[in-house]
Amino acid sequence: MQVILLDKVANLGSLGDQVNVKAGYARNFLVPQGKAVPATKKNVEFFEARRAELEAKLADVLAAANARAEKINALETVTIASKAGDEGKLFGSIGTRDIADAVTAAGVEVAKSEVRLPNGVLRTTGEHEVNFQVHSEVFAKLTVNVVAE
């Protein structure tokens, strides 16, 4: 199925590209998320008329994402207190929601879906590097310090 991309999609293309994808991927993911429209003659003409407007909107979204990433990087460290045993093992774990809540409480709005934990949830006290994917092209880093209550 031919679609026109309205946003940058990983491993597929960027704004304005006409790509061929499986019908289910287009129907169930790309179109409902607003990342693509079917490449009909009417949609192609409509897209070409609005191309500059869409590119400007995409640039604004990218600039806003960069600004948020700078704010996250400026925080440097966020401290989270949790119950822990004598050897530094936590009772439970600290996941994406806990980290997102702590960063939001520190003054930067972050969704839990933007938090990336490559090694899984945090289960020990100490300092941990946490990545944030604010936009498909914009990443930020933050140190989370887990202390025992």
Curated annotation (Swiss-Prot):
Transmembrane segments: none
Signal sequence, start to end: none
Highest taxon listed in the record's lineage: Bacteria
NCBIfam families with a match to the protein in the record: L9
Similarity annotation: Belongs to the bacterial ribosomal protein bL9 family.
GO cellular component terms listed in the entry, alphabetical order: ribonucleoprotein complex; ribosome
Primary gene name: rplI
Keyword Ribonucleoprotein: yes
The protein's name in its UniProt record: Large ribosomal subunit protein bL9
